[in-house]
């Protein structure tokens, strides 16, 4: 009886470790003005197609700016008007990875960019897990 309890306990602990939600973002980028960059956000520990992925910008000393949202399940994308034409959001379901491409880069694009998971809510996004952030520096 004791051994079976220990086995079940260890099994549940192991399952918990493997199911930990993580959003792992690509590393820091240093790019020239006028160029493009594509950063990634690899999800693990949950069903990728059951939650949305948001992208958020934070410039030094400033607040968070929501860039946009993509639903990996059906491909729906919602952009902040300010970032339309600047940003393209995509996903690769086979690798549970979300991507954000930024083009025509200027010094104003230098910032840390975060991905964040959210539930599907019409018109509002409840972020529950965040990536560690990808710093982007645009040099002239």
Curated annotation (Swiss-Prot):
InterPro entries (alphabetical): Ig-like_dom, Ig-like_dom_sf, Ig-like_fold, Ig_sub, Ig_V-set, IgHV
Residue ranges annotated for the Ig-like domain, each copy included: 20-139
Pfam families from the UniProt entry: V-set
GO MF entry, a single one: antigen binding
Signal peptide region: 1-19
SMART domains according to UniProt: IG, IGv
Cellular component, GO, one term: immunoglobulin complex
The keyword Cell division is annotated on this UniProt entry: no
Keywords: Adaptive immunity, Hybridoma, Immunity, Immunoglobulin, Signal
Biological processes per GO annotation: immunoglobulin mediated immune response
Protein name: Ig heavy chain V region 93G7
Organism: Mus musculus (Mouse)
């Amino acid at each position: 009886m004791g051994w079976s309890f220990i086995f079940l306990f260890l099994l549940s602990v192991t399952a918990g470790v493997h199911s930990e939600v993580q959003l792992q973002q690509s590393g820091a980028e240093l790019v020239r003005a006028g160029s493009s960059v594509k950063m990634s956000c690899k999800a693990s520990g949950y069903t990728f197609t059951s939650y949305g992925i948001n992208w958020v910008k934070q410039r030094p000393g400033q607040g968070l700016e929501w860039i946009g949202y993509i639903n990996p399940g059906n491909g729906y994308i919602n952009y902040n008007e300010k970032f339309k034409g600047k940003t393209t959001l995509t996903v690769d379901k086979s690798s549970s990875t979300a991507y954000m491409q930024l083009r025509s880069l200027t010094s104003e694009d230098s910032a840390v960019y975060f991905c964040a998971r959210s539930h599907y809510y019409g018109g509002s996004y409840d972020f529950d897990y965040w990536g560690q952030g990808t710093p982007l520096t645009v040099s002239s």
